[in-house]
């Protein structure tokens, strides 16, 4: 029977301040440079993990994510930081775990419905439910007063 291995998780941020201190928590670290980006690979509590900075903007995030998938065998992704905005009622320091991600900054009308991603037939894309659950549990365990945001459009 083949040995199962943990999926590699990447934690990405646009800015170094949004990842402050994470690299120091990793064990067995290795710095990897690919496609003009610097990644730190290691383990956190036994979980294979890659840390990376994308720079600002969704194109920078998309190209960094592509590099992670193609060259570093990443199967799961968590983005930390503001990620483009703060929803109503959310304060700096709050933990928000998204259930979906959205196309929000390109209006393709009249060719397609508003916000729809051409070729995909959708404006919202569901996150991995198992990863969402793990992140919610971790947030609740690590924060004194964790608020749970259920608004799928945050």
Task: Mark where each language-model region is.
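Glycine-aromatic micro-motifs
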Residues: 2-3, 65
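Short, conserved "active-site rim" segments that organize catalytic pockets and cofactor/ligand binding
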Residues: 7-26, 30, 48
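Glycine-rich phosphate- or other oxyanion-binding loops that anchor nucleotides, phosphorylated ligands
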Residues: 8-9, 33-154
């Amino acid at each position: 029977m083949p040995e199962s291995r943990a999926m590699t998780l990447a934690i990405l941020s646009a800015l170094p301040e949004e990842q402050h201190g994470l690299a120091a928590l990793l064990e067995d670290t290795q710095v990897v440079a690919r496609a003009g980006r610097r990644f730190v690979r290691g383990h956190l509590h036994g979980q294979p993990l890659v840390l990376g900075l994308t720079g600002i903007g969704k194109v920078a995030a998309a190209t960094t994510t592509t590099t992670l998938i193609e060259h570093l065998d990443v199967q799961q992704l968590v983005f930390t930081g503001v990620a483009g905005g703060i929803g109503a009622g959310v304060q700096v320091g709050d933990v928000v775990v998204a259930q979906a991600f959205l196309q929000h900054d390109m209006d393709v009308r009249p060719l397609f419905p508003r916000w729809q991603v051409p070729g995909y037939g959708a404006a919202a894309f569901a996150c991995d439910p198992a990863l969402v659950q793990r992140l919610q549990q971790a947030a609740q365990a690590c924060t004194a007063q964790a608020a749970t945001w259920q608004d799928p459009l945050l």
